[in-house]
Amino acid sequence: MSYTITKKDIFEWCSYPWQSLISRTDLKVNLEVSADRKITMTKVGNLMTEEVIENNKQNKITKWVLPAGPTDQYDVFIDRVNNENISLKNLWIFHMDEFLDWQGRPFPIGDTYESLEGTMNSCFYGRIKDELNVPLEQRIWPRINDIDYADNLCEKLGGIDTVWAGVGAKGLVAFCEEPRSYCYHISEEEFANSKTRIVNINDDTIVALSQRTFGVCYDRVPPMSITVGFKVMLSAKRAVLMVATGTWKQTVVRVAMFSEPTLEYPVTFFPKYVPNVILYTDENTLDHPMSHEIRGW
């Protein structure tokens, strides 16, 4: 039977003072808390760098799943790669997702909001020295004209080393969101084995994205995407969750720390399937208003 979070559960999780969470031993994830977002993302950028360095020493390939946001950690990673001459020739990057228009077609590749590939070309690959950069054929994007490619390649390579993941307010990772339909149901097992696919973006995610960037102009956010599925991401040896967005994410971090796997918050699947799940967050995001006295005025 699928697990459902009760009001009692979520109210209790949100009531804990954030300081008390640091010493708890019953969390589903390993917790790394910093004073602010900058420190948090600097730690993540250094963690990325150290993984590549270690695998290069052992002459091993490195296999990642990367998001097109957040991007703060890439500043640290890119600076170290360029300054320390760290080769990325053995790095394979599976990109999480790409926006599609309302007819399910990709947008032109460019440094625009609608083009996640263009965003990564500009903010990531375009800032790395050519002689150190990831080879083009090792930059794997989900494509509507070859939808099984990423899944088949991931299996051929033996799975992922680390998923570096932002997390949505309702627990999305990539655009793997809670399935919502009155007419069909997906089991937790099916979701955990989900492949690369084309999806409609949930309405509340469109609201969140539009608030963040477009003054809550919903129509400015693309309504569809192509996303890698959990089959690729849950093949990882490690998942690093990067959540330092403040008020929008104060509840989802509590859910990630305490909940059993539930389709309502897909991020909760990671602790069940991935051996090492680390939540990097800051004090503001880890705090919660329900852990303080709340009045109506």
Could you tell me what each predicted segment is?
Residues 77-88, 110-111, 178-188, 259:
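A glycine- and small-aliphatic-rich helix-loop capping segment at beta-alpha/alpha-beta transitions
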Residues 9-32, 39, 86-164, 220, ...:
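Ligand-binding beta-strand-loop-alpha-helix segment within the catalytic cores
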Residues 174-226:
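Class I SAM-dependent methyltransferase SAM-binding "motif I" and its flanking Rossmann-like core
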Residues 1-64, 82:
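N-terminal glycine-/serine-/threonine-rich phosphate-binding loop
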Residues 2-6, 11, 28, 34-35, ...:
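ATP/nucleoside-binding phosphotransfer catalytic cores, i.e., glycine-rich phosphate-binding loops
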Residues 151-152, 173-187, 251-256, 291-292:
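A short secondary-structure junction signal
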Residues 64-73, 168-172, 246-249:
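Gly/Ser/Thr-rich loops at beta-strand to alpha-helix junctions
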Residues 159-172, 176:
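Hydrophobic, aromatic-enriched interface-forming segments
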